Regions:
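N-terminal pre-catalytic segment of deacetylase/amide-hydrolase enzymes
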Residues: 1-50, 56-65, 69, 90-91, ...
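Metal-dependent polysaccharide deacetylase catalytic core of the NodB/CE4 family, i.e.
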Residues: 46-47, 68-191, 200-208
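Short glycine-enriched loops at secondary-structure junctions
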Residues: 53-57, 106-109
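Alpha-helix N-cap/loop-to-helix initiation residues
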Residues: 56-57, 82-83, 161, 213-217
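Generic recognition of short, well-ordered alpha-helical segments
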Residues: 61-62, 88, 163-166, 219-223
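Charged helix-capping and loop-helix junction motifs
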Residues: 190-193, 220-221
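Short amphipathic alpha-helix with an adjacent loop that forms part of the alpha/beta core around
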Residues: 196-198
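Catalytic grooves of carbohydrate-active enzymes
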Residues: 201-239
Length: 249
């Protein structure tokens, strides 16, 4: 079991992040969790983006197999740690390049947060030099593994220091937020995950995890995505989108 994925215990025990509404420098420097939706979504055209984080851990073939069998595209955010640990999983993704795009989740799964501390028990980068290494080394790993340069970066834990975000963009990466957190770090039961995904509205950028094959949440990811397909949803990959195709929320 990957200690870096969230569990119910870590969610309850983790120190609260400083509220952004507080005045002063502490609030300005508080980590933020950027939201993102698809820009061209309309009520009469159901379209969503499925994004799956491959943090340190294993390969959830239950999810990947279901996507392949149903012809549903997805964006995979992989760490260098995951790529090295899961050559068979990577091979499956590369065998279906029409469905899967592999993007940058960092080298060592270090949150791009400045200063001391942890988020959900994970030590943060601390400074911009470490942020730059995490992002660029992660990108180099993706390029070496897939032959394609990633365009998007998603932080470990999904949190960023505001001062780190323009530096990541300066390195040439879009910051991949999301609007629907489906599995809370692969910690939720299958029924809850399926219900969250099935209730998605048009334009959602969904985040779930594909690195925890021994947890029940993965079955919920499959069930929820299949429910969206039955609703007639179209699925898009982030690498097929331009800067004007997504909007912050």
């Amino acid at each position: 079991m990957c200690r870096l994925c969230l569990t119910r215990r870590s969610l309850l025990a983790a120190p609260a992040l400083a509220p952004l509404s507080h005045a002063g420098a502490a609030a300005r420097d508080s980590p933020v969790e950027p939201g993102m939706r698809l820009a061209d979504a309309t009520p009469d055209r159901m379209v969503v983006a499925v994004t799956l984080d491959a943090c340190p851990g294993d390969f959830d073939a239950r999810i990947a197999t279901a996507l392949v069998e149903s012809g549903i595209p997805a964006t995979i955010f992989a760490t260098d740690l995951w790529l090295r640990r899961n050559p068979a999983g990577l091979a499956l993704l590369l065998a279906h390049r029409d469905l899967f795009d592999v993007e940058n989740h960092g080298e060592l799964h270090i949150p791009p947060v400045l200063g001391p501390g942890t988020i959900y028990g994970i030590p943060v980068a601390g400074d911009l030099a470490t942020v730059r290494r995490e992002v660029t080394a992660g990108a180099a790993s993706i390029s070496a593994a897939t032959g394609m340069a990633p365009r998007w970066y998603r932080a470990a834990t999904g949190y960023y220091s505001p001062a780190a975000m323009p530096e990541i963009e300066r390195l040439g990466f879009g910051i991949a937020g999301y609007s629907l957190n489906a599995d809370a770090g692969a910690s939720l039961p299958a029924r809850s995950v399926a219900a969250r995904i099935a209730r998605a509205t048009s334009g959602e950028v969904i985040v779930a995890h594909i690195n925890q094959p021994y947890r029940p949440s993965g079955l919920g990811v499959v069930a929820g995505i299949m429910a969206l397909q039955r609703r007639g949803a179209s699925f898009v990959r982030l690498d097929r989108l331009g800067a004007t195709d997504v909007v912050p929320v």
